[in-house]
UniProtKB/Swiss-Prot annotation:
Name of the protein in question: Yop proteins translocation lipoprotein J
Record-annotated membrane-spanning stretches: 218-238
Gene Ontology CC annotations of this record: cell outer membrane
Similarity-based family: Belongs to the YscJ lipoprotein family.
Gene assigned in the entry: yscJ
Length: 244
């Protein structure tokens, strides 16, 4: 009797705690740990598991998926994947013209610069666009000089204006033939990046919507009811026996 009761209680508790579903897969250990810590700071039940190729995946309660995505999106996660030189210039690639090689090289450099800028605290999105120089246009006149545009979307509570000279210097030193005064930087603050959701969180237990704070009490109450069932049945049995 006691074994059956304990087993029933354990099964109920495991059922009530719910099952977790994949939130994001194929993310790096570093980024995954940052995302996991962020979700737990917001009060969500989140875990990580190993994934393919040394990556990891994040899991959350099915009822928390929408909120988890919203929290991570406002914090700039998951970060964008950028192309590397190896991606742009594969070993088995076909021979390209000098202009094509230069374009691919500058694209790879722009990707690397974007990756570097995205590592700055508070940067949500970083883009670098490079315009190649034109030696001569169709009318024989001198072509347009090379230029670059940098777009950064950042947290609203961080002042990025002071970083503009360093950002321009980084781009200037990374791309050959690009003049400092031909680099423009556009900063766009994200008004809600650092806002945290303080609304009460609800969870579903046996199709009953309860607040996260009441979840433990409801599980305890239902477990107690299961424990009382065999006791009441036994008491009823003895009462019927005495009547006979």
């Amino acid at each position: 009797m006691k074994v059956k009761t304990s087993l029933s209680t354990l099964i109920l508790i495991l059922f009530l705690t719910g099952c977790k579903v994949d939130l994001y897969t194929g993310i790096s250990q570093k980024e995954g740990n940052e995302m996991l810590a962020l979700l737990r700071q917001e009060g969500l039940s989140a875990d990580k598991e190993p994934d393919k190729d040394g990556k990891i995946k994040l899991l959350v309660e099915e009822s928390d998926v929408a909120q988890a995505i919203d929290i991570l999106k406002r914090k700039g996660y998951p970060h964008e994947s950028f192309s590397t030189l190896q991606d742009v210039f594969p070993k088995d690639g076909l021979i390209s013209s000098p202009i094509e090689e230069l374009a691919r090289l500058n694209y790879a450099k722009a990707q690397e610069i974007s990756r570097t800028l995205s590592e700055i605290d508070g940067v949500l999105v970083a883009r670098v666009h490079v315009v190649l120089p034109e030696e001569q246009n169709n009318k024989g006149k001198k072509g347009v000089a090379a230029s670059a545009s940098v777009f950064i979307k950042h947290a609203a509570d961080i002042q990025f204006d002071t970083y503009i000279p360093q950002i321009k210097q980084l781009v200037n030193n990374s791309i050959e033939g690009l003049a400092y005064d031909r680099i423009s930087v556009i900063l766009v603050p994200s008004v809600d990046v650092r806002q945290s959701s303080h609304l009460p969180r609800n969870t579903s237990i046996l199709s009953i919507q309860v607040s996260e704070e009441s979840k433990g009490r409801l599980i305890g109450l239902l477990s107690l009811l299961i424990l009382l069932l065999p006791v009441t049945n036994l008491a009823q049995y003895f009462w019927l026996q005495r009547k006979k």
